[in-house]
């Protein structure tokens, strides 16, 4: 186990209750520094409560939160960027005026804020929006502005709650690119809450899954996929299906098979964890004409569904 000092964010046995509803029940999570950490779970799982604690909006009833190895305190909020799911731009202000207002709230001087805003507005191709009324912006346009506002002060930890909702595919990909760039170039740690599992597959290196206020699983994405794979392989061959399945015996589990008229069969097989795929392939080539053999690809969607069953 890595030590707390290597973590951007640590939650230890955190609990929060609203009346009779337990929103978080003894949740412990560690977010490694410089990671893009996916916070997953169905609606009502406790994700928003957890995020609001980290952002300093609410406090836990019990448990501890640490920010880069020290107890999270009010002053740390200046080093946290937060894009909430419920967008919060003021409709009756101009875009540039409002962006400057939020930058000043983060402690930035006017000249520094104007310089950074100019760079970001150009990068995200919104430099023509400075004098627009916020009320004239589409959902996707407003989302871009709020994304800029959340990262303008170069936070050490960036919290993104459903950051891609409201974007078309082109702009969603642009935001994904910026999230990766913030991590790779600035060393920003990102806490990403989303229902979009394709984004988790594309962006996240670590995840935690919460459900009904409890943590169900946590870990590196590659290791969670490997565990969910459970020795399953995609195996395609040409030959006699009945003879091959008989030869398999107890050495592998047949999960599924799809056959074509020319005696080509696509299988999903489960081989024991202690059996290297190379050893299985060497045996199989003596039995049938092997067309392909590879570890089964497991998406985070499958990991999620298996965990909450």
Where would I find each of the regions flagged by the language model?
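Pre-NBD coupling/linker segments of ABC/ABC-like ATPases
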Residues: 2-4
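ABC transporter nucleotide-binding domains
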Residues: 6-9, 16-211, 217
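Solvent-exposed beta-strand sheet faces enriched in polar/charged residues
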Residues: 12, 236, 294-296
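Non-catalytic surface loops within mature trypsin-like serine protease
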Residues: 33, 128, 237-239, 271-273
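A generic structural signal for secondary-structure junctions
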Residues: 68, 107, 146, 226-229, ...
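ABC transporter nucleotide-binding domain
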Residues: 177-270
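C-terminal coupling/interaction segments
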Residues: 272-309
């Amino acid at each position: 186990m890595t030590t707390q000092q290597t973590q951007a964010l640590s939650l230890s046995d955190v609990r929060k209750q609203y009346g009779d509803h337990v929103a978080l029940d003894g949740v412990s999570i560690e977010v490694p520094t410089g990671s893009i950490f996916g916070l997953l779970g169905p609606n009502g799982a406790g994700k928003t409560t957890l995020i609001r604690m980290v952002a300093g909006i609410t406090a836990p009833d019990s448990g501890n939160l640490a920010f880069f190895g020290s107890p999270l305190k009010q002053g740390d909020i200046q080093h946290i960027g937060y894009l909430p799911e419920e967008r919060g731009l003021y409709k009756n202000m101009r875009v540039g005026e409002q962006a400057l207002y939020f930058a000043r709230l983060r402690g930035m001087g006017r000249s520094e804020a104007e310089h950074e805003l100019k760079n970001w507005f150009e990068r995200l191709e919104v430099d023509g929006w400075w004098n627009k009324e916020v009320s004239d912006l589409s959902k996707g346009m407003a989302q871009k502005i709020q994304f800029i506002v959340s990262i303008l002060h170069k936070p050490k930890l960036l919290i993104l709650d459903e950051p891609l909702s409201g974007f078309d595919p082109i702009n969603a990909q642009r935001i994904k690119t910026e999230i990766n760039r913030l991590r790779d170039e600035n060393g920003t740690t990102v806490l990403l809450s989303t229902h979009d599992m394709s984004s988790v597959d594309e962006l996240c290196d670590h995840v935690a899954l919460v459900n009904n206020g409890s943590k169900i699983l946590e870990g590196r994405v590659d290791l969670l996929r490997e565990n969910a794979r459970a020795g399953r392989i995609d195996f395609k061959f040409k030959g006699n299906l009945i003879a091959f399945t008989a030869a398999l015996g107890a050495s592998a589990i047949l999960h599924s098979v799809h056959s074509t008229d020319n005696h080509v069969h696509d299988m999903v097989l489960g081989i024991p964890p202690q059996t290297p795929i190379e050893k299985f392939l060497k045996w199989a080539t003596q039995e049938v004409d092997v067309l392909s053999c590879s570890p089964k690809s497991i998406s985070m969607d499958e990991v999620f569904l298996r965990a909450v069953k």
